[in-house]
């Protein structure tokens, strides 16, 4: 029965995230897992943790099937097998989280374990999942709270801090249900309610300073299917799509085209780029576009973002998607690359230190696709940037919940840094996000259009930008020490 309960608890947890946003589930589901683990010996806790993880990632991340089958040319059985293996491996993180939790904490006092060990250990394993095997920083508990009062903790403690608070509340819920004394139940209720009150108050504190002048922006959503996009015969049509939407809107100060909007090297469309750059300068418009970059001297290809017109800079994507944008040099990986025939699947990562990207005299932080999901990497490269730009192409996962999940992640990055964030995608969800992490405007998916809005450059730093995650690390250490009192 406990094993079935663990599986169900994991399977319902994705409902707490976008596009469903039933955020209270994020407190209940881990509380159920905690109850199961506290009744399990180490190996049993491993198994039940794996079941929870299989349900969680099976329901929340199985969208990889779409890209493997529809765009990787894998037949249905093979695509299903790869998807199951993907979910199987992800579930191992929670399995070993359960094993170690049971080994270290099961015999400690239940109250201390629930209040301190459980939330601290949960965040430790979220962090491990973000760095091991290139990382999969997806579906962290804290993302589910982007629309709850707990979002107020975002500028202070970031995603890991909010995850810590969510898991802490889960521990309180477990104690509320299992405690027999009224005074303990009342204390648990107070501990559950208090973070929401504090978080709500924190939402009224501005940590940064928006500029006085607004900049009009336009995000072009080309809505070009993957197969058409990479077909050489449709190159002219693709370029015309983006140019025609731009030509009608040169009155915008900033125009953004999505990831690989120009699906060909700059050397091959130099005349087009020169003309586009000249026209943008004539209208005092900064135009940025995703484009693959080929370095002839090194024979390397990069996923890039180029700035034209009233601005300058070229950004090369640093953190590549494993097996989507990069393969190791092993023979097996080379065979996989040839079999799946994925466009731009043998890229090189850009250098850590790159020239600043600037539009209309405003420095901004560019990120491409998957990079926005790495909390510490975003912080490390933000520095004095005054807004954030993310270019993406979620058509790889068309018809799934992945685009909504990634947009929610982008909302958290905007909230953590209190910067406007321009989220430009090929097929949607294109959006403009406020420094409060709210979606100011968004475009419907699978439509060709230009999303317009206004942003303000932001100066100053949030506490998270100043301190990084050191306070959260300190709290985790204290929590773990308290467990052994």
Swiss-Prot record:
UniProt KW keywords: Acyltransferase, Cell inner membrane, Cell membrane, Membrane, Transferase, Transmembrane, Transmembrane helix
Domain CN hydrolase: 220-457
Protein name from the UniProt record: Apolipoprotein N-acyltransferase
Transmembrane residue ranges: 8-28, 49-69, 76-96, 121-141, 157-177, 186-206, 464-484
Organism encoding this protein: Coxiella burnetii (strain RSA 493 / Nine Mile phase I)
UniProt pathway annotation: Protein modification; lipoprotein biosynthesis (N-acyl transfer)
Family matches, as Pfam families: CN_hydrolase, LNT_N
Encoding gene per record: lnt
Any single GO BP term: lipoprotein biosynthetic process
Active site: 259, 317, 369
